[in-house]
């Protein structure tokens, strides 16, 4: 498809209606390479966070971003299950932030503007390597947060093969650092997956979906204040959804594929936006994995809902679509945000497709309610702050309030999220993978009046594609969402929070301490 110079001059990055779709090929992020360290027993990686220029669209000017090794998304880690690696995450960023900072939020009033700490999302890891929000550090580790312990993080990868991702987690500015580009894939490889003959190598493609807005000069746009404006300026906003879709760092890209099966590793890395993904002609696909790894068996789907931070591995069979193009859509939106990317089935089949969609994937280890030694009731709610802005809270507490979730090592607990707000919240618990038990409607007015949970209907089982291991769960409005999990191998300080980043930063995050 040819595009003229005059078309380029008509493109206004701030106006999505002027941006042609499907003109940039989907990039595949570079693979992270270990630095060979003589004295190191384990593969050792040195990753630098740097400011860089990035081309979001062929008709955009270059955009200043922050990226791991100056790339957006950052380099993809390919690690083996049970193989320990070490990573030195280094801040080489300038002292001034790309985006407006609200200094009324936790962690921002007396701290440097540019702070970073890396969380591998979904990793089963010791607390000193988890990327605690207060373990932040500035350029060259000059200033460090109160829970900072070490410059080199250790990941044992003692968990199922899974699509994880890494991103910034600095207290009070996570939404800004992630939006600026500090995200990447972290893929754990499992021998079991090779035995299953799933699509692999160049037929296994990671897809990181985000939304962005741009100024007319191509720079990243992020709102400085609410509408109408709060008396604080800059001010956090209660939600932010950009007006373009970005996949692997490109605005509305396309991918050329062969007429065969592909595995796509999907990550919703957006700040606020949830997606319901489907192909324009209802072409079916098979979900084979959730956040924490393989499902017990594939689930055939025509659409897939992904909240921020949720992942899904899917297999799409293009074999009957030779010569055709297929648009992946977001059925949550009628406008430009309804388009994700395009697949063009135009490459010749390089060899016979020997990959499979197995009838069963892996055996499951059940967690039953009888195993739980404690059940916690946790309210998902909101209040109004001193500046008349909405402030989201977990269990009526702020980040700085004393820790109240203190599970014991090796214990099994049930957590029930009672959502009193009018929208869904993706709740992420660090350290663990959990199972969703059910969601159940309750009488909101009665609960707000006297705190009593009066159920108004039967418990609703999770959908088949939600029955695998999860680290992020959609807590629906007007529902009590119950999860069950075991706390094993590590004790110490972790967190749990809403993964709508504007909520996490204000003030929907709580400490969690695993005790002996």
Model-derived segments and spans:
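Histidine- and aromatic-rich segments of cupredoxin/plastocyanin-like copper-binding domains
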Residues: 125-142, 209, 213-216, 221-368, ...
């Amino acid at each position: 498809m040819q595009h003229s110079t005059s078309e380029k001059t008509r493109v206004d990055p701030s106006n999505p209606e002027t941006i042609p779709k499907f003109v940039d090929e989907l990039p595949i992020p570079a693979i992270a390479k270990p630095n060979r360290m003589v004295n190191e027993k384990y593969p050792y990686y040195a990753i630098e966070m740097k400011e860089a220029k990035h081309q979001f669209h062929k008709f955009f000017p270059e955009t200043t971003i922050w990226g791991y090794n100056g790339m957006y998304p950052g380099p993809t880690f390919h690690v083996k299950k049970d193989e320990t690696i070490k990573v030195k995450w280094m801040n080489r960023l300038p002292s001034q932030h790309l985006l407006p900072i609200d200094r009324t939020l936790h962690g921002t009033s007396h701290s440097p503007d540019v702070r970073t700490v890396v969380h591998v999302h979904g990793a089963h890891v010791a607390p000193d390597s988890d990327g605690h929000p207060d373990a932040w550090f500035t350029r060259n580790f000059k200033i460090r947060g109160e829970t900072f312990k070490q410059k080199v993080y250790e990941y044992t990868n003692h968990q199922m093969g899974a699509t994880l991702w890494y991103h910034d987690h600095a207290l009070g500015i996570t939404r800004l650092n992630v939006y600026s580009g500090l995200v990447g894939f972290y893929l754990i490889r499992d021998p079991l997956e090779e035995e299953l003959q799933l699509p692999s190598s160049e037929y296994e493609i990671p897809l990181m979906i985000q939304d962005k807005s741009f100024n007319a000069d191509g720079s990243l746009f992020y709102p400085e204040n609410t509408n109408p404006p709060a008396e604080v300026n800059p001010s956090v906003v209660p939600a932010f959804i950009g007006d373009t879709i970005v996949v692997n760092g490109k605005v509305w890209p396309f991918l050329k594929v062969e007429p065969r099966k592909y595995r796509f590793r999907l990550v919703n890395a957006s700040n606020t936006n949830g997606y319901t993904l489907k192909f324009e002609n209802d072409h079916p696909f098979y979900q084979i994995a959730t956040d924490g790894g393989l499902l017990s068996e594939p689930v055939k789907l025509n659409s897939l809902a992904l909240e921020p931070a949720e992942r899904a591995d899917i297999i799409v069979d293009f074999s009957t679509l030779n010569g055709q193009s297929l648009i992946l859509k977001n059925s949550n939106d009628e406008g430009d945000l309804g388009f994700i990317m395009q697949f063009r089935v135009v490459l010749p089949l390089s060899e016979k497709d020997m990959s499979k969609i197995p009838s069963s994937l892996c055996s499951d280890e059940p967690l039953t309610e009888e195993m739980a030694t404690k059940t916690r009731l946790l309210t998902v709610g909101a209040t109004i702050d001193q500046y008349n802005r909405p402030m989201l809270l977990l269990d009526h507490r702020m980040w700085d309030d004393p820790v109240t979730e203190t599970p014991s090592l090796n214990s099994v607990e049930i957590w029930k999220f009672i959502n009193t707000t009018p929208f869904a919240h993706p709740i992420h618990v660090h350290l663990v993978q959990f199972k969703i038990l059910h969601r159940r409607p309750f009488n909101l007015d009665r609960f707000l009046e006297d705190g009593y949970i009066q159920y108004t209907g039967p418990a609703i089982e999770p959908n088949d594609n939600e029955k695998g291991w999860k680290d992020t769960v959609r807590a629906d409005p007007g529902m009590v969402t119950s999860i069950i999990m075991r706390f094993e191998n590590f004790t110490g300080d972790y967190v749990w929070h809403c993964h709508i980043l504007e909520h996490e930063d204000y003030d929907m995050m709580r400490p969690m301490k695993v005790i002996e």
